[in-house]
Every structure is written in C-alpha cells, then in structure tokens.
Amino acid sequence: MNDVLHAFGRAFSSVLHPRMLALTIWPMLAAFALWLGLAWFYWDSWSHWMSALIAGSDISGWLQQHGFSSVVRYSVLLLLWLLLAPMILITAVLIAAVLEMPLIVSFVAERYYPTLEKRRGGTVLGGIGNALIAVLVFAGLWIVTLPLWLTGVLVPVLPLVLAAYLNQRLFRYDALSEHASAEEFRAILETSWGRMYLLGIMLALLYYVPLLNLLAPVLSGLAFTHFGLARVQELRRRGEP
C-alpha cells in the first residue's frame, strides 16, 4: 500500500515540472474536440440508430403504450452520452499512452532512477497489442454493462472499476517495457497486480474532479511509471526474479 501511495504522490509532484505541464491538458482537450466534432456531424445518425435499437425492445413498447414516450426520447440521449463518455476517456488515455509515455518514462527515469539499467523486455508490437486488448476489453465491458447503467444498479461503482482496468492495463506495459526484462515484467505483474489495480482506482477518481480530470491521463502515466520503476529497482536490489 505504501508503494501505491508513494507513486501516487510522486505523480503529483512530477506533473508540476514544466516538461510535464506541457503534456498535461492537450490529451483530454484533443479527445473532447474530436468527439464533439464527430457528434456535430453525426448526431442525427447516431440518434436514429439508437432510437431504432430501443424501439425494438419490449420496454420501449410498454412505455409508449402507457404514454411515456418522453422517457424513450430521454433514454436515447442518455445512452448516447453513456457511449460517448467512454470514447472520450479512451481517446485521451490512448493519446497519453501512445504519444506521451515515452517522454514520461524518460523524464521519470532521468530524475529518479538515473542508474537503472534498461533491459528492454517490451516491444513496439507488444505495446500495440496491449493497447488493443485494453481498449477492446474496456469497450466490451462498458457495452455489456449498459443495462445496469439504465437501472441505476452499481452506477457509482462501474465507472471506477472500468476506468481502473483501462488505466492499469494500458499504462503498466509502457511504464515497464523499456527498463524491465521480460522475466521482471512477469514477476511484477504476478506480485503487484492488485496494487496496480488499486492505483488505477485512485487515478480513476481524478476524472470526477474538475480541472484535475484534464491532468488525469498524464498523472496516470506518471504514477504507473513511478510504481513500475520502483518495483524494478526493488527486484534487482533483492536479486530477483
């Protein structure tokens, strides 16, 4: 638990450095701009598609028969937003992971772990594959759990759990791939998966805090890099794996 809090705290101190501040806001702003632009051009098409999807359900027929057509219309808007919100999150996190993580890892390693040997256990293809798996699983779980969103069941919990999964799955590979060997990478995943998920939950909470949510993608990259490199250093100090 201490190493999780330590990584979380160091992420906040690191993000204040000018090099990191320059990276912070634009992933979320770029994601918002992209999806709002797409919504501007395709909102009518998306609404028609969602309306047709809902119209085929038994619940929609029952609501319309009993004079609750407005509920159906609001359900269309709600479902579209519930699909749009994770797309914005995925896009912002992907921008940070793909374009900014090399800079983040280099910054953290130079300032905090200058003597840590690079054993390059990861590959470019491995990073791409990891990102694809993370996004597909996250999107699939979000879609599968949509009925729970509409019923209100687990609404406070689901976003945290899903965002935590995306955070830890996406950032852990890039945080470790340059410095950890393949054996060290596997050892860290086996022994620290729970702590990485906890770190993912703590970072997911930032998306609910105004202004901090703009920094969340870069803070996530910093936190997982601090956590990962500290674990690599600890393994080598103990002569493991």
PLM features per residue range, with description:
Residues 1-138, 142, 182-183, 187, ...:
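Helix-coil boundary and N-terminal low-complexity module in membrane systems
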Residues 75-106, 149-177, 211-235:
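Selective recognition of hydrophobic, aromatic-rich stretches within alpha-helical transmembrane segments
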Residues 17, 153, 193-194:
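Amphipathic alpha-helical protein-protein interaction surfaces
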Residues 137-150, 207-211, 215:
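Alpha-helical transmembrane segments and their membrane-interface junctions
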Residues 193-222:
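Terminal membrane-proximal soluble interaction domains of membrane-associated proteins
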Residues 168-196, 200-201:
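Hydrophobic alpha-helical transmembrane segments and adjacent short intramembrane/lumenal linkers
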